[in-house]
Every structure is written in C-alpha cells, then in structure tokens.
C-alpha cells in the first residue's frame, strides 16, 4: 500500500488551496483601492511587477526542480505573496526593488525549504526585511498622501518615477512630500519628533496628521480591517491570531499612553497606522508559518503585538510588523511543542 506524505497542517476543511488564496487576494482589494486613492497609481504598478516576477520566478524554480508548473502556479500562493510584498513597499520605489524582493521571497524563502507548506518564514515579510536592511533609503521614501502632497502623482508620473524615465532620473521629485522633505510616514514622524524632544500633541499638529491619525493611513488600515472581517466571515482564517495581536498591542500601548501621553501615542493610533491591519488579517494568519493550536495561535498573535509595540516605541524602526512576524515565525515550533492540545484521554486525578 502506498502512502502519500504531505506537509502540515493535516486538518482538511474541504477547501482547496487555490480557493483559499483567491479569497485572500480578493479581500485585499478594498485596501488596494484605498491605498491607490491616497498614494497614487504606484501601488498598482508595484503590484503588477511583483505578481509577474513571482510567477516567473516560481515557474523557473519548478522547472529546475522537475515539478509540474501549471498545476502549482494555479494554487495562487505566489499571487498572495507578491501582493503582500508589493503593498508593503513605497509606491514609487524603483522597479528593481520589488523584483529583487519577489524573487527572494519565492526562490529563497519558499522553494529553498521545499515549496508551499514547508517554508519556515512568511515569504513576503522575509523579502520585505531583506529589502529594508539592504536598501533602507529606497524602502523609507514614501510619497505624501493625496490632500497634502505638493505634487500629485498620476499613472504616467508614477511610471516615470518607478522606471526612472525622463529628465528626473528617478522619483526624487515625486517623492517630495510635506515640509520639503522626503515623505515620512506618521510612524516615522512620531519617532523622529519624540527623539527631538517634541510631544505627541506637537507632532499631531503637523499636516501629515488628521487629528490623531495619519492622513490616508487610517483609511487604508480601515479598508484592510474590512477585508479581514470578510475573511473571518468566510472562515478562511480563524480569529485567534488577529485578536491576539490587537489585544496585546492595545494593552501595551494603553500602559504607555496612560503613564506618559506626551511621549506615547494611543492604542488606536497603533492599530490604524503603518501595516497593522494588513499584518493582523493577511500576513500573520498564514497557516504554514503560524502556530497551529487555538491556544498556541493566541500566544503567537500576542507575541507579535508585543514585539510590534516594543520595536515601534523603543527600537530603531518605526513600523515593526515584518520583524515581529518573522520573530514569531521562529517561535511557532516552540509554541506548538509546549502548547499541545490533549487529544486522547484526560488529565489524571491527583
């Protein structure tokens, strides 16, 4: 008798991988549309570049490994990986940046460990961290959101900036944001201002903030929240990791905010800034690299929320989502080992 050996998780819900990945990609659409509305067509161009590169890279690796190409490409996992990476990088980043990140995510992080179901780390976040460490200037040059940008960025301008076409030789002109500096995200601005001795209230007076939230970023996170709730409704993901992240981040931020509101932002600011909601529902919930038991998923999510807060508040990077997810990925086997449900029998009476 022949037995088929497959990768974990071994619990089947009757939904094919391609269907799950397609639903995840579809639920990203609200966030993609809002992100494009506020930050221009660069996000869509980066998305197309990442998807094309990811599929091409996966096809080449599958051919080299002697694996079926078309069947594997149809599982849509490369689509989700490419989308998450593209949505995490600046819209006007040079074209080669997303190409390098996509190839690294697919070839090194995913297929070097055996392909889908065998990778230890989230491919999109691993690709993002490699780009952030290798090219920090390009990875932190965001455009100003619509409404406060000195220069609007239409589709043609975005293409010129991304592909370095025309006399501008890149996107420096289009990256000019508020106060004559290259665009700083709300998290960047808060961290910089606090290091200069300003209070959060003084920082919130800047044009990049709309009240207590960053212009554009609140709505982007709200859109990803809406897409994430649909994923929960469709039972594509379970609630444990998402709740763990949000609860831990809320509790940690609440302590800091209550103790010193002049030097700590509110929990809701943490929730609706940077890539929080994208990570909460679309990145951290990757079943391959996360903990598997319900209690383990809660611990896994809580660890991500705590790490996000610690790095954002005390670390050198303003948005810590990628680092938090990768560190939690490292701990997932440890969590699964010590937080295992009692499958058979019961605890003996003392």
Curated annotation (Swiss-Prot):
A Pfam family of the record is NQR2_RnfD_RnfE
Record field: transmembrane: 25-45, 89-109, 124-144, 212-232, 239-259, 265-285, 298-318, 319-339
Keywords (alphabetical) are:
Cell inner membrane, Cell membrane, Electron transport, Flavoprotein, FMN, Membrane, Phosphoprotein, Translocase, Transmembrane, Transmembrane helix, Transport
Q: Which GO terms describe its biological process?
A: electron transport chain; transmembrane transport
Question: What is the membrane topology here?
Answer: Multi-pass membrane protein
Q: What is its EC number?
A: 7.-.-.-
Q: Which residues carry this modification: FMN phosphoryl threonine?
A: 185
Enzyme class, spelled out: translocase
Gene Ontology cellular-component terms listed: plasma membrane
Q: What is its subcellular localisation?
A: Cell inner membrane
Q: Which cofactor does it need?
A: FMN
Query: InterPro entries, per this entry?
Result: NqrB/RnfD, RnfD_bac
Under the subunit heading, UniProt states: The complex is composed of six subunits: RnfA, RnfB, RnfC, RnfD, RnfE and RnfG.
Could you tell me what this protein does? Part of a membrane-bound complex that couples electron transfer with translocation of ions across the membrane.
Instruction: Name the protein family.
Output: Belongs to the NqrB/RnfD family.
Protein name in UniProt:
Ion-translocating oxidoreductase complex subunit D
Q: Which species does this protein come from? A: Shewanella denitrificans (strain OS217 / ATCC BAA-1090 / DSM 15013)
């Amino acid at each position: 008798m022949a037995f088929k050996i497959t990768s974990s998780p071994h619990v089947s819900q009757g939904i094919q991988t391609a269907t799950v990945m397609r639903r995840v990609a579809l639920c990203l659409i609200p966030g993609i549309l809002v992100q494009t509305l506020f930050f221009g067509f660069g996000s869509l161009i980066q998305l197309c570049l990442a998807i094309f590169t990811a599929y091409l890279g996966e096809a080449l690796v599958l051919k080299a490994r002697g694996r079926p190409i078309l069947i594997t490409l149809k599982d849509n996992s490369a689509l989700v990986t490419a989308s998450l990476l593209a949505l995490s990088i600046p819209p006007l980043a040079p074209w080669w940046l997303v190409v390098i990140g996509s190839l690294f995510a697919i070839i090194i992080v995913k297929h070097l460990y055996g392909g889908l179901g065998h990778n230890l780390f989230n491919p999109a976040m691993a690709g993002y961290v490699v780009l952030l460490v290798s090219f920090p200037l390009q990875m932190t040059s965001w455009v100003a959101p619509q409404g406060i940008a000195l220069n609007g960025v239409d589709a043609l301008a975005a293409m010129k900036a991304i592909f370095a076409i025309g006399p501008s030789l890149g996107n420096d002109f289009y990256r000019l944001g508020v106060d004559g500096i290259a665009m700083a995200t709300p998290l960047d601005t808060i961290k910089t201002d606090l290091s200069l001795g300003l209070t959060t209230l003084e920082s919130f007076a800047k044009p990049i903030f709309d009240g207590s939230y960053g212009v554009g970023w609140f709505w982007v996170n709200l859109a990803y929240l809406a897409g994430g709730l649909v994923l929960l409704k469709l039972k594509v993901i379970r609630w444990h990791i998402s709740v763990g992240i949000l609860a831990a981040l809320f509790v940690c931020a609440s302590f800091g905010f209550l103790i010193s509101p002049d030097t700590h932002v509110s929990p809701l600011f943490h929730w609706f800034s940077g890539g929080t909601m994208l990570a909460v529902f679309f990145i951290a919930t990757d079943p391959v690299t996360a903990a598997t038991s319900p209690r383990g998923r809660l611990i896994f999510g809580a660890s991500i929320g705590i790490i996000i807060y610690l790095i954002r508040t005390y670390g050198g990077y303003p948005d810590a989502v990628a680092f938090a997810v990768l560190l939690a990925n490292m701990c997932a086997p440890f969590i699964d080992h010590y937080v295992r449900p009692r499958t058979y029998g019961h605890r003996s009476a003392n």
